[in-house]
């Protein structure tokens, strides 16, 4: 397809002439069939909802086709309307546009749906089993058409994948405002998502899937690396040297969109990592992309390979293509010493493809979850109980186990596993409680990211160099409390190119605090203005950040004043970003830990070398981080109190309400 044909297809939106119905493509990974949850009347409603995208003259053709999709897959994806062109992030000038900001958003959307990047690309699922960009291909086509037409005086409003329309606004307003899964709280159970999504009225956007900000496994790679690195240091009782990390064994599960970062992170940290993945498609994709070194499908071969690698203190990553419970039970039976353990199965979505029970094949599980969901639920919970039993045996021998924010502890507790101690608390910490919260989030460090819209590796190399120079300059005057974090982050960005992290767009992830993000972004803007970077850069972050997410079992699990179940921070954050210069903003229900368990939001900002971009950087990035530090400070988190005091000294006009600490004895004596 020529560039002109591609641009014409984008501008056309939903085509005037129905495209040919193509055969089901078995070359890519597909979402499992969803449970049959709709009543007969609701199925009729789902069809009416789907057909309203199309002229009446096509209803007789499309109605039986969509009804068959609903019967076969549990959803209406509108496969007929999947574009003929290849899906990937093109250079920004390839997109037909009147607004350069809108062209940047088109690039980001296509990256989220790139088969090299997305988990189930034909079902518009980017990661996590159900993290959707859109609900169907009609929505995709309409959105791309609107983006190609809009000006910088309009805003596109997105309701859970559905483009409500272009509304008049102004150049400093966001070009797109996204909401995903915003349901009334009393109707936010997992089955409510199943029903609403099958009806075509809501979707689960995960975090960066529905907000057009996913950058492949690299997006979680830096966070996973510093988590593994600092978990290893906790085991060693030292944070001064990496020598003792060599030969440590790290065991986990998942090679999907987020979990797929684990083996690469293990390599960067210098450990032996073993990650189980039941889906051969996912394991082979990560191996082909260089994110895992070895594939093993036989435990009798894997166990000796693990022993040998540990004895030789090699840095190597191994994937076990099989069920994680089989792996944990075998490690426990063989009494292999595991240093670090975690889990990244998609337990935010345990009954619909996020967790596969032991003793069943992938295909058997996919069939049962749709045909007999109650029995499947029992098998999942039995499997979780067995997994926890094996993990408990290994932790009794010295393994440090941490929950990686995927609802493992929560779902294990609900399954009746031996996961709660005598004090009523979980046996194991969340990684945010032990590592990410007190060491990073409380000081404002989080997953800042950028995408070079030229698509040129040379531009990415330039941004890496600029970011390293900025960080090194900040490091010279950094307070002692954050020197270790700065050193790890500088090392990451200097090694990023060599570690071959790019999958999809020319993107980079870098943990940085408010000062670092603003100064790096300002330096990028200057470099674009001077022509050192050839095209605009999109700035963003994961929602998994200092201010973006209220999640009591992950991002805010180290909030102990009782407000961990409140979502004021995430809501205030997206509102504040929207009028301080974000190009697009999003707010979601459920990213990471699951539907009804989380509120999370994010942003994207296209910078083009202009003074407007410089102002947006100054105003928005400051708020986007310090909102969360202020909230964490009010919760009496020591690191945040230090960080916010420092920020108030640095920034005129910034004044935060500080907590007054109370003596424990004073309170305790009143209740004796």
Give the location of each predicted region:
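Residue-level detector of anion-binding/catalytic polar loops
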Residues: 272, 337, 400
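Long, compositionally biased, glycine/small-hydrophobic-enriched stretches that function as flexible linkers
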Residues: 1-198, 202-213, 373-523, 527-540, ...
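Catalytic or ion-translocation cores adjacent to nucleophile or general acid/base/metal-coordination motifs
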Residues: 205-229, 233, 239-240, 246-249, ...
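Short, solvent-exposed amphipathic alpha-helical segments in soluble enzyme
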Residues: 267-269, 332-336, 417-421, 528-529, ...
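Small-residue-enriched alpha-helical segments and adjacent helix-cap loops
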Residues: 537, 541-572
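Solvent-exposed alpha-helices and their adjacent loops that cap or buttress functional pockets
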Residues: 149-151, 167-172, 186-187, 239-245, ...
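Active-site/ligand-binding-proximal alpha/beta "capping" segment
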Residues: 317-345, 349-352
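Glycine-rich beta-alpha junction loops
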Residues: 280, 322-325, 344-349, 405-411, ...
